[in-house]
Amino acid sequence: MQLSRVRSVLLDVFALAKVKQTLLLLFTMYTAYIVGGGLGKPYERHLVVLTLGFITIAAVTALNMYFDRDIDALMERTRDRPLPAGRLDPLKVFIATVAATIVSVILAWRIINPHFALAIVIGFLFDIVAYTYLLKRRTPLSIIAGAVAGGAPALGGWAAAAGRIDVNALLFSLIVATWVPSHIWFLATYYRDDYRRANVPMLPVVADTPIAVASGIGLGSLVMGYSIVGLWVNNVIGTVSLIVGVIAAIAIFHLAVKYAELGGDPNYSRTAFKKTNMMLGLVFLVMMLEKVVSYIIS
C-alpha cells in the first residue's frame, strides 16, 4: 500500500512538471549549449547544465500550475491535474518550486556563469510574473510573454556554453519563441470551449476570424525562418540545419494557411499542434547532430 502511495505521488509530480514539454524545452537548451561551444567541455559541466536546466524548467512549469489551479479546475482537459484534483498540497508545491528555482539560480551563477543564471531569471519572470500572473487572464497579448519564456531555455543553453548573451543566443531563443504561438494557439483552438468556460482570453477564443490566429502563427514561422538563416549566416549552424530549419518554418506557415482555410477546425488544430512539436524537436535534433558530426571529423 505504501509503495502504491509513493508511485501515485511520483506520477503526480511528473504530471505537475509536464515532463514531455519540459524535456522538449530542455532539449532546445542543450542543443543551444552544444552548438554554442559546449561540446568540448568536461562531461561534469554537461551534467550540471542539464540538471539545473531540468530542475528550473520543471519548477517553473509546476509553479505555473500552482497559480492556474483555479482555472484548471474549470477546464475538462485539466481538472484532473494534481492540484485542482486535490492530490497535492498547493502550499508545499509553491514552497518546493520557489525554493528549487532560487537554488538553481544560485548554483547556475556560481558553477556555470552569471549569464546562465540571468536566462533562468528571465524565463521565470516572463513565465510566472508576466504571462501567468499578469496577462494570461486579461489579454490575448499574453502570448508575447509566453513566447519570451519559451525561448529562455535556449537562451540559457547558449549562455552556459559561450559565457555571454549575444545575437546568436537571441536567434536561438527566437526560434523557440516564434514556435510558441503555434504550440499554444493550435491547442487552445482544440480546447476552445474549455478556455471559454474558464474565461481565459486566448486569441482563438476571442478572435472574430481564424485569419487572426493564422496570421500570428504565419508571422511567427517567418521570423523563425529568418532566425535560422541568421544563425547560418553567422556560421553557427551548417547547411543541413539551414535546409531542415527553413523547411520546418515553411511547413508551419502551411499549417497556418490550412488552419485559416478550414475555419479554425478543432480536429485539424489538434493534428497541427502535434506536428509543430515534432518540427521544433526535429530542427534542434538536426542542429545538434550536425554539430557533433562536424566536431568528430574536424
Swiss-Prot record:
Its EC number is 2.5.1.141. It catalyses: heme b + (2E,6E)-farnesyl diphosphate + H2O = Fe(II)-heme o + diphosphate. The keyword Transferase applies. It is found in: Cell membrane. The chain crosses the membrane at residues 23-43, 47-67, 93-113, 115-135, 143-163, 169-189, 211-231, 236-256, 278-298. Pathway: Porphyrin-containing compound metabolism; heme O biosynthesis; heme O from protoheme: step 1/1. Its main location: membrane. InterPro entries: Protohaem_IX_farnesylTrfase (IPR006369), UbiA_prenyltransferase (IPR000537), UbiA_prenylTrfase_CS (IPR030470), UbiA_sf (IPR044878). It is an enzyme of class 2 (transferase). GO terms for biological process: heme O biosynthetic process. GO terms for molecular function: protoheme IX farnesyltransferase activity. Keywords: Cell membrane, Heme biosynthesis, Membrane, Transferase, Transmembrane, Transmembrane helix. NCBIfam families: cyoE_ctaB (TIGR01473). Converts heme B (protoheme IX) to heme O by substitution of the vinyl group on carbon 2 of heme B porphyrin ring with a hydroxyethyl farnesyl side group. Belongs to the UbiA prenyltransferase family. Protoheme IX farnesyltransferase subfamily. Carbon 2 of the heme B porphyrin ring is defined according to the Fischer nomenclature. PANTHER family: PROTOHEME IX FARNESYLTRANSFERASE, MITOCHONDRIAL. This is Protoheme IX farnesyltransferase. It comes from Hyperthermus butylicus (strain DSM 5456 / JCM 9403 / PLM1-5).
